[in-house]
Curated annotation (Swiss-Prot):
Pfam families: CUB, EGF_CA, Sushi, Trypsin. The gene is Masp1. Residues 25-189 are annotated as: Interaction with MBL2. Ca(2+) 1 binds at E73, D81, D126, S128. Residues 1-24 form the signal peptide. Residues 25-143, 190-302 form the CUB domain. Residues 25-189 are annotated as: Homodimerization. This is Mannan-binding lectin serine protease 1. It comes from Rattus norvegicus. The iron and 2-oxoglutarate dependent 3-hydroxylation of aspartate and asparagine is (R) stereospecific within EGF domains. N-glycosylated. Some N-linked glycan are of the complex-type. CDD domains: CCP, CUB, EGF_CA, Tryp_SPc. Keywords: Autocatalytic cleavage, Calcium, Complement activation lectin pathway, Disulfide bond, EGF-like domain, Glycoprotein, Hydrolase, Hydroxylation, Immunity, Innate immunity, Metal-binding, Protease, Repeat, Secreted, Serine protease, Signal, Sushi. Residues 454-701 form the Peptidase S1 domain. The lineage of its organism: Eukaryota, Metazoa, Chordata, Craniata, Vertebrata. Homodimer. Interacts with the oligomeric lectins MBL2, FCN2 and FCN3; triggers the lectin pathway of complement through activation of C3. Interacts with SERPING1. Interacts with COLEC11; probably triggers the lectin pathway of complement.
Length: 704
C-alpha cells in the first residue's frame, strides 16, 4: 500500500462537529482526507449522543483512519461509550476507554484500513458519565490500492506485466506481444518477420516454452538473387497434432515460389529442405488450445562457386578457403616492401568478389617492389648510392654528405637513409627529415705568414680572411666592412647602416636607416676598386640594429644585414665563428679592412694589422680625459706606442683571433670608433661580440 498526500491538490478540510441533540446524526464525507472529532471536543462530550460519519473515496482507493487523541468512558466490551469502525458488511474495530490506562480497548497507534472505498465511523455515548471524558480526535485519508498485488491470483489479473498507479492499474505485454482489447490478455505479434542475412535461426514464439495460442506467424527469408537457401529443423519439434486428421489445429508450412512443403506438425522434425530459391516464406498457425513447445530451424544460403585463386608472387590472399562462392570476398595484399599494382595504380590492398554467375569481379593484381624514387636534393650536399645501378627500391641505401670542406652535417649524423616499406627514405635518427648542412666557420684554406711586427699594417694575403664583407654603394664605392655569419647574415657596425645624424640632436629615427636597396654586399673581395673573379655581389633583404644601440656614445654599435640569397662558399668565401668564451688581455687579434691605414689614402687591396687586446681600465683611462666613454659592451686593442690601428673606412670590419685548441678563427669585435688613428695612447675601440652573442644567435639562428 502506498500512503498518499493530497495537500498540494486540495484545501485542508476539517470536520469538527459539536452536537447537542440526543438523537442519532449522520455526516457524509467525500473528501480525500479530513478530521473527525467527538462532539464538544476538546471539552467533554454530551451524554446520550450518537454521530455517524460515512466516508467515501473514489474507486481504486481505501480509507485509512488513525487517532491522535482518545479519551472515552471505559466499559466491558465497550457497552457504554464507544467508537465503532465498519464497512457495509463488516465491523473493523470498536474502541473505548482512556489511552493512558485502557490500552487494550483504545486504538493507540493502530491504523484502521477499509477493504474498499467506504468506511463508517460511529460515536455513541450512553445516558450518564460519572467522570469528565474529552472524547477523541481522528484523521482519515484515501490511500491507493495496489491492484497488481491484490489481483495476482484472480482470473482478471494481467497476462504478463501489471503496473499500479494512484487510483488504478494497467497491463502490458512482453516483447513480441500486443495487448488484447480486453486490456488484460496478451497475444503474440509474429507476422512480417524479415531475415536478410546469409545464415540465421528462426523459432516459434517463446521457444522452447509453449508457443502462444491463436497465433498467425509469418517469416520471410529474402536474399539477393543468386543464393539458394537450405532449411534444417532441430531435434526438438513439438506442434499439436491429431491422431486421425493431419495437422488440423497447429502447423508450419514452407513456401518458395510455386513450391510448398508441409503442413508439418507432431513430434517428428521434417527432413532438411533445399528450396533452390533465394526468397522463402514460413507460415506458422496455432489455435486457442494446447501446451506444445514449438520448433526451431536454422537456414544457410549458398551460391555459385568461383574458380580457385592463386596469390600473386610476393603476395597473399585472405581469407584462404578451399571453396569460394557467390558474395565471398577476398583481399589481396603484398609482402613487406611490395605494393599491389592494378591497372598502373599502386595501392596497399585490392579486393575482389565472387559474382552470382560464378566469376570473379576482377583479375588478380601483381605485387611490385616499393620504390622510394629519386632522393631529395640536399642543400649544400650531395647523395651517393650503395649500388652501382643506383637502385631506389625497398631496402636500398643512400648516403647524404655535405659539400666539404665548406659545409658539415648537423649533429654529425651518419647520413645513411634506407628505402622503407612505406616508400620513403628513412634515417634511424632523423626519420624522414633530411639532414642539415651547416657552413664550416673559421677554417680558411690559406694560412697567414707571421705579421706580428709589421709596422702600420700590411696587405693581406688573398683568402686568409674569407669572412670579410664589403658594404658598397651601388656605384661600387665601399663605405664599411662586415663579417659573414652562417650562410646569409653579415655582422657590421650599427653606425654603418644609417645616415649621419644632426650633431646637436643625435636621435635616430627609422627615416635615418639605409634602405636595403641603397647598398649591396660583396663577398670574396680582395681589391678595393678592381674587380675580382672570385667576388660575389649580393642583394640585401633586411637590416636590423642592436636594440640598445646609442649613436651618440656608440654603445652596442652592432647591426645585422640579412642577405636575399646565400653566397657560394669556397676558398675565398667562408663565415667566421662566434666566440665560445670571453677574450683576455694581451690576446693578439687581427683587424682587416680597406681603410686609410695611416697612409692618408685608401689602399688598393685588403689590409690587416695584428695588435693585442688592451686592459679595459687602461682603455677607459686613456679616453676619460677626452670626455669619451668606454662601456662594458666595448673592447679595446692596439699598441701603447701607437702605429697600428683601424682607421676611416674600416668601420664594421672584423677583429678576429685564432682558437689554438680548435684551430678555428672566431670574431672578437667589430671596428667601431677611436681617436687620432694610430697615435700613442689612442687605442681602437671595438664592439665586443661575446656579451652580444645571445642577441646575434637569437636573430640569425647561427651556431658554430
Amino acid at each position: 500500500m502506498r500512503f498518499l498526500s493530497f495537500r498540494r491538490l486540495l484545501l485542508y478540510h476539517v470536520l469538527c462537529l459539536t452536537l447537542t441533540e440526543v438523537s442519532a446524526h449522520t455526516v457524509e464525507l467525500n473528501e480525500m482526507f479530513g478530521q473527525i472529532q467527538s462532539p464538544g471536543y476538546p471539552d467533554s462530550y454530551p451524554s446520550d449522543s450518537e454521530v455517524t460519519w460515512n466516508i467515501t473515496v473514489p474507486e481504486g482507493f481505501r480509507v485509512q483512519l488513525y487517532f491522535m487523541h482518545f479519551n472515552l468512558e471505559s466499559s466491558y466490551l465497550c457497552e457504554y461509550d464507544y467508537v465503532k469502525v465498519e464497512t457495509e458488511d463488516q465491523v473493523l474495530a470498536t474502541f473505548c476507554g482512556r489511552e493512558t490506562t485502557d490500552t487494550e480497548q483504545t486504538p493507540g497507534q493502530e491504523v484502521v484500513l477499509s477493504p474498499g472505498s467506504f468506511m463508517s465511523v460511529t460515536f455513541r455515548s450512553d445516558f450518564s458519565n460519572e467522570e469528565r471524558f474529552t472524547g477523541f480526535d481522528a484523521h482519515y485519508m484515501a490511500v491507493d490500492v495496489d491492484e497488481c498485488k491484490e489481483r495476482e491470483d484472480e482470473e482478471l489479473s494481467c497476462d504478463h506485466y501489471c503496473h499500479n498507479y494512484i487510483g488504478g492499474y494497467y497491463c502490458s505485454c512482453r516483447f513480441g506481444y500486443i495487448l488484447h482489447t480486453d486490456n488484460r490478455t496478451c497475444r503474440v505479434e509474429c507476422s512480417g518477420n524479415l531475415f536478410t542475412q546469409r545464415t540465421g535461426t528462426i523459432t516459434s514464439p517463446d521457444y522452447p516454452n509453449p508457443y502462444p495460442k491463436s497465433s498467425e506467424c509469418s517469416y520471410t527469408i529474402d536474399l539477393e538473387e543468386g543464393f539458394m537457401v537450405t532449411l534444417q529443423f532441430e531435434d526438438i519439434f513439438d506442434i499439436e497434432d491429431h491422431p486421425e486428421v493431419p495437422c488440423p489445429y497447429d502447423y508450419i508450412k514452407i513456401k518458395a515460389g510455386s513450391k510448398v512443403w508441409g503442413p508439418f506438425c507432431g513430434e517428428k522434425s521434417p527432413e532438411p529442405i533445399s528450396t533452390q530459391s533465394h526468397s522463402i516464406q514460413i507460415l506458422f498457425r496455432s489455435d486457442n488450445s494446447g501446451e506444445n513447445r514449438g520448433w526451431r530451424l536454422s537456414y544457410r544460403a549458398a551460391g555459385n562457386e568461383c574458380p580457385k585463386l592463386q596469390p600473386p608472387v610476393y603476395g597473399k590472399i585472405e581469407p584462404s578457403q578451399a571453396v569460394y562462392s557467390f558474395k565471398d570476398q577476398v583481399l589481396i595484399s603484398c609482402d613487406t616492401g611490395y605494393k599491389v599494382l592494378k591497372d598502373n595504380e599502386v595501392m596497399d590492398t585490392f579486393q575482389i568478389e565472387c559474382l552470382k554467375d560464378g566469376a570473379w569481379s576482377n583479375k588478380i593484381p601483381t605485387c611490385k617492389i616499393v620504390d622510394c624514387g629519386v632522393p631529395a636534393v640536399l642543400k649544400h650536399g650531395l647523395v651517393t648510392f650503395s649500388t652501382r645501378n643506383n637502385l631506389t627500391t625497398y631496402k636500398s641505401e643512400i648516403r647524404y654528405s655535405c659539400q666539404q670542406p665548406y659545409y658539415k652535417m648537423l649533429h654529425n649524423t651518419t647520413g645513411v637513409y634506407t628505402c622503407s616499406a612505406h616508400g620513403t627514405w628513412t634515417n634511424e635518427v632523423l626519420k624522414r627529415s633530411l639532414p642539415t648542412c651547416l657552413p664550416v666557420c673559421g677554417l680558411p684554406k690559406f694560412s697567414r705568414k707571421h705579421i706580428s711586427r709589421i709596422f702600420n699594417g700590411r696587405p693581406a694575403q688573398k683568402g686568409t680572411t674569407p669572412w670579410i664583407a664589403m658594404l658598397s654603394q651601388l656605384n661600387g664605392q665601399p663605405f664599411c666592412g662586415g663579417s659573414l655569419l652562417g650562410s646569409n647574415w653579415v655582422l657590421t657596425a650599427a653606425h654603418c647602416l644609417h645616415h649621419p645624424l644632426d650633431p646637436e640632436e643625435p636621435i635616430l629615427h627609422n627615416s635615418h636607416l639605409l634602405s636595403p636597396s641603397d647598398f649591396k654586399i660583396i663577398m670574396g673581395k680582395h681589391w678595393r676598386r678592381r674587380s675580382d673573379e672570385d667576388e660575389q655581389h649580393l642583394h640585401v633583404k633586411h637590416i636590423m640594429l642592436h636594440p640598445l644601440y646609442n649613436p651618440s656614445t656608440f654603445e652596442n654599435d652592432l647591426g645585422l644585414v640579412e642577405l636575399s640569397e646565400s653566397p657560394r662558399l669556397n676558398d675565398f668565401v667562408m663565415p667566421v665563428c662566434l666566440p665560445e668564451h670571453p677574450s683576455t688581455e694581451g690576446t693578439m687579434v687581427i683587424v682587416s679592412g680597406w681603410g686609410k691605414q695611416f697612409l692618408q689614402r685608401l689602399p688598393e687591396n685588403l689590409m690587416e694589422i695584428e695588435i693585442p687586446i688592451v686592459n679595459y681600465h687602461t682603455c677607459q683611462e686613456a679616453y676619460t680625459p677626452l670626455g669619451k666613454k668606454v662601456t662594458q659592451d666595448m673592447i679595446c686593442a692596439g699598441e701603447k706606442e701607437g702605429g697600428k690601428d683601424a682607421c676611416a673606412g674600416d668601420s664594421g670590419g672584423p677583429m678576429v683571433t685564432k682558437d689554438a685548441e680548435r684551430d678555428q678563427w672566431y670574431l672578437v669585435g667589430v671596428v667601431s670608433w677611436g681617436e687620432d688613428c694610430g697615435k700613442k695612447d689612442r687605442y681602437g675601440v671595438y664592439s665586443y661580440i661575446y656579451p652580444n652573442k645571445d642577441w646575434i644567435q637569437r636573430v640569425t639562428g647561427v651556431r658554430n
